[in-house]
C-alpha cells in the first residue's frame, strides 16, 4: 500500500547567505551549500509529499533563508525556526510583529546540544520564552544527545506543562553501543508519562556517529521501544537530510524509515506515523 509521507526534518543552508559556525573548518561533506533541488528526484521516488525545514543555526538569517526556500519549494509546508529564547521580550516581539503572521512558521528549535550546559533550557529567561511559545501553541524541537538533555526537557515539561515538545532523533538512543536500553531507556519511560512529548524517528542511521554497516535490525529495537512507551500516536518521521548523507542517500533513508515503521506499528497506524501525526503536531 502506498502511503503519503511527511518528512519532518530537512535542512538547507547557504554558506554565502549566512554563517554556520559548526561547519567552519570542517572537512565533512556537509561543509558546503545544500539546496532542496538536490533531492527532488529521490524525494518523488521515495513518495515524500510534504516536508518541514528545520533550523541549523542559532540566528534569524537561517530562519529567513528557510522561509524563502519553503515559499518557493512547492512541497515544504512548514519551518521550524529559531528565536532568541534568552531574550523573552524580543522573542515576544518577533512573534507578534512577524512570525505569528507567517503561515509557514510552525515551530522553534535551538541547538541545545551545542551549548556547554545541558541544562541550558532551564535558565529563567529561556523558560519565560518557552512559556510564550506555549501560550501561542508553538511546539519546540528538543535536539538532545545526552541523557541530561532528556532530564532537562522533563523539567521544562513540569515548568511549562502546556508546551508541546518533540525529541529530535529520539534524543540519540545508544544504537552504536547496542545497549538495551540503558539510561536513555530509563529516562524515556518517565518522559513518556508527560503527554506533551512526541518522538521524531529520524537521524538514526548516524546515531552515535558510528554508522559503518548500520542495519535496520540494529535500529529496530529502539524504534520498537519508543512506540511501545509513547504510542504510535505520538511518533512521526524525518529524514535529516543532508546530515543523513553521512550514512546513506535520501531515498535509502526513507526506505529505512518505512521499513522500521511498518515493522513496529500496526498496518492501520502506518499512515499516522508517516504523515498524519506530523500534520497534527506542526499544524501543517
Regions found by a protein language model. Give the residues of each.
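Active-site metal-binding loops of divalent metal-dependent hydrolases
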Residues: 10, 56, 83, 170, ...
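An N-terminally biased module of ancient metal coordination in phosphate/nucleic-acid-related enzymes
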Residues: 1-65, 70-71
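Soluble or luminal CAZymes and related metallo-dependent hydrolases
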Residues: 31-38, 58-62, 87-90, 125, ...
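Conserved, mostly hydrophobic/aromatic
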Residues: 9, 51, 66, 79, ...
Amino acid at each position: 500500500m502506498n502511503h503519503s509521507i511527511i518528512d519532518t526534518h530537512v535542512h538547507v543552508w547557504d554558506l554565502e547567505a549566512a554563517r554556520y559556525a559548526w561547519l567552519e573548518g570542517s572537512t565533512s561533506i556537509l561543509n558546503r551549500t545544500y539546496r532542496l533541488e538536490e533531492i527532488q528526484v529521490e524525494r518523488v521516488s521515495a513518495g515524500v509529499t510534504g516536508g518541514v525545514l528545520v533550523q541549523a543555526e542559532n540566528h534569524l538569517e537561517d530562519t529567513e533563508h528557510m522561509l524563502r526556500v519553503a515559499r518557493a519549494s512547492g512541497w515544504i509546508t512548514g519551518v521550524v525556526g529559531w528565536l532568541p529564547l534568552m531574550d523573552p521580550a524580543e522573542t515576544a516581539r518577533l512573534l507578534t510583529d512577524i512570525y505569528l503572521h507567517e503561515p509557514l512558521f510552525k515551530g522553534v528549535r535551538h541547538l541545545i546540544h551545542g551549548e556547554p550546559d545541558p541544562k541550558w533550557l532551564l535558565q529563567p529567561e529561556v523558560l519565560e520564552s518557552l512559556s510564550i511559545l506555549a501560550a501561542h501553541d508553538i511546539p519546540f524541537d528538543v535536539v538532545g544527545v545526552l541523557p541530561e538533555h532528556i532530564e532537562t526537557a522533563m523539567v521544562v515539561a513540569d515548568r511549562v506543562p502546556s508546551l508541546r515538545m518533540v525529541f529530535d532523533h529520539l534524543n540519540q538512543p545508544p544504537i552504536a553501543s547496542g545497549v538495551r536500553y540503558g539510561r536513555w531507556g530509563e529516562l524515556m519511560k518517565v518522559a513518556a508519562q508527560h503527554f506533551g512529548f512526541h518522538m521524531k524517528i529520524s537521524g538514526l542511521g548516524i546515531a552515535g556517529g558510528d554508522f559503518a554497516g548500520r542495519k535496520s535490525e540494529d535500529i529496530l529495537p529502539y524504534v520498537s521501544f519508543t512506540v511501545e512507551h509513547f504510542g504510535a500516536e505520538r511518533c512521526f518521521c524525518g529524514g535529516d537530510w543532508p546530515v543523513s548523507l553521512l550514512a546513506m542517500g535520501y531515498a535509502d533513508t526513507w526506505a529505512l524509515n518505512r521499513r522500521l515503521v511498518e515493522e513496529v506499528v500496526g498496518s492501520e497506524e502506518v499512515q499516522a506515523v508517516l504523515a498524519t501525526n506530523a500534520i497534527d503536531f506542526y499544524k501543517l
